[in-house]
Amino acid sequence: MSISRSLKIVATLYRYGLDDFLEGHSRLAFLHKLFGLCPVRRDTSAPLPQRVRLALESLGPIFVKFGQVLSTRRDLLPPEYADELALLQDRVPPFDGDIARQVVERSLGRKVEELFVDFDLKPVASASVAQVHKAWLRQPDGGRGREVAVKVLRPGILPVIEQDLSLMRTLAGWVEKLFADGKRLKPREVVAEFDKYLHDELDMMHEAANASQLRRNFKGSDMLIVPEVFYDYSSREVLTLEWMHGIPVGQIERLREAGVDLQKLSRFGVEIFFTQVFRHGFFHADMHPGNIFVAADGRYIALDFGIVGSLTDTDKHYLAVNFLAFFNRDYHRVATAHIESGWVPRDTRAEELEAAVRTVCEPIFEKPLSEISFGMVLLRLFETSRRFNVEIQPQLVLLQKTLLNIEGLGRQLDPELDLWDTAKPFLTKWMNEQIGWRGLLRTLKHEAPQWATTLPTLPRKLNEALGSAKTDLLVEGYIQLMREQKRQNFLLLLIAILLAALLAKSLL
């Protein structure tokens, strides 16, 4: 741990009066006095949430990124802090283009002139982890090939990140041990989540894989374009993508002048979101306006694939159940769905959770449906969840953040956008497919290889369970065996029914 970096953090906390958090804490009274020895001018004129944001900005890009991640954890933070941290911007001066050139050559093992016809040393975009340069691939005959964006990892960033993460882990441990609310805030868990997020961003091949997956999911789509990845020109430090031409989605007047149908575009955004979540179970989780452009043909263009989310079939099912129940005001079903999914502890009383959900949702539903925010519904529920010791899953936090971005974007394009009217047919159709014959056939097809493997092993499993010397293992093994036997019998019965139906049809 760097002493100079630690001292800078202490001085910054004191400058913005954040040592006030220590006030009244008997075990930390000596620290509060030590802060007073800092030879730094103290400014406490701004509200405390704003001072937290300013302190993070002063501590540099890694702390800014941490604040951005923290702003999504509305299940942990009071609203005024989450709102203030959401204002943080990842603004970092670019590093020298010649250094970027050296990184490319070292990482790809070839001279830039051998890889590209032109490589613009002036970056078109810069952030804390990487910056982007424009280039053209060199064809075998030496001619100019495809226009590309070359994303280059900032050199020397890893030691800086590891140093700051080490300090964050130490601070998180202190908060958890010394503050009454420390365990509920789960600071070490939040830092661990941030650690994973940062290290994913440091590996350009991780982003390349995300882009490829999303591109495959939307192949031939009339709503979304995802740039092609050039793997022969990519590595852990360099990512080369197809250059995309378009208008930034936030430039509404330019879109109008280009003849883009803004109402259609806003609906596309909602449909793209729900398609990613419920069809693919894999979604772009950083869809703020800076990462979205609009092509000449009116399709969205997605950029920056460092942050994605994924959902299991169970997550998708309960999300759909919750959305449909919310907008039908079936709060009891919302409560039971939360308990069934494991999002709240099993011993939670459904009636108490139902009452809490009703308290959150009824004021929201007094508004016209076109003004209701899906994201705000989830946000309010996250805030309510603190009363019920809810374990908010990271993928659901990403989902809520993405949904807020999509809603904000959609209503910026079309203030009259009725999100529920756009989403309900999609959700209803998806649910019908899951519980109807199509869903059954899809499940049978998916599970068939597992049945073929599992059924022959049942006698051996029974013998192993009966031969166990420990009673608890015997009982557990027997229960598990009976459950599996019932499941297999039920599925075999369904197969028999389907085969009989097909046979009867062929005989008619």
UniProtKB/Swiss-Prot annotation:
Q: Where is the Protein kinase domain?
A: 118-494
Per the record, what is one GO cellular component?
plasma membrane
Task: Output the Gene Ontology terms for molecular function.
Answer: ATP binding; protein kinase activity
Q: How does it sit in the membrane?
A: Single-pass membrane protein
User: In terms of domain of life, where is this protein from?
Assistant: Bacteria
Task: Describe which pathway this protein belongs to, using the record's wording.
Answer: Cofactor biosynthesis; ubiquinone biosynthesis [regulation]
The biological process GO terms on file are: regulation of ubiquinone biosynthetic process; ubiquinone biosynthetic process
Q: Spell out where the chain crosses the membrane.
A: 488-508
Q: What class of enzyme is it?
A: transferase
Question: Known InterPro entries for this protein?
Answer: ABC1_dom (IPR004147), Kinase-like_dom_sf (IPR011009), Prot_kinase_dom (IPR000719), UbiB (IPR010232), UbiB_bact (IPR045308), UbiB_kinase (IPR050154)
What this chain does, per the entry, is described as:
Is probably a protein kinase regulator of UbiI activity which is involved in aerobic coenzyme Q (ubiquinone) biosynthesis.
- Under which name does UniProt file this protein? Probable protein kinase UbiB
Q: What is the originating organism of this protein?
A: Chromobacterium violaceum (strain ATCC 12472 / DSM 30191 / JCM 1249 / CCUG 213 / NBRC 12614 / NCIMB 9131 / NCTC 9757 / MK)
Gene name of this polypeptide? ubiB
